[in-house]
Amino acid sequence: MTIWVDADACPNVIKEILYRAAERMQMPLVLVANQSLRVPPSRFIRTLRVAAGFDVADNEIVRQCEAGDLVITADIPLAAEAIEKGAAALNPRGERYTPATIRERLTMRDFMDTLRASGIQTGGPDSLSQRDRQAFAAELEKWWLKVQRSRG
């Protein structure tokens, strides 16, 4: 099992949580980005640099992730594709995507895209709060406990 990170848009504070978790869990952590990233030295942490371009990193994560892996992303279509492959998906605010919730999120995303295309300013998400960081760490821990139980 591997934790895949859509690293170009992932907040640094979330990456720091993931670095510590990868060491503690002894779990491979792969940060996929179209730019160079500085990561702590670790046998569990690596970066995968992809070409710049629309959805290049997302497509690489989808290509390589497998059932049982965890994908960290705020990108709804990427999360949907990861779930289709049997991976778990978690956003940096600690929201676990599920087959039941991903359809709703895709619909809302498409609606917001339509509003923006018509000239309506929709604004962006709030900045990451302490509560978001705690929720992320808690959901990551829940995923890890589930992995441990499945291993016996």
Curated annotation (Swiss-Prot):
NCBIfam families: PRK00124.1. It comes from Escherichia coli O81 (strain ED1a). The gene is yaiI. This is UPF0178 protein YaiI. It comes from the Bacteria. Belongs to the UPF0178 family. It holds the Pfam family DUF188.
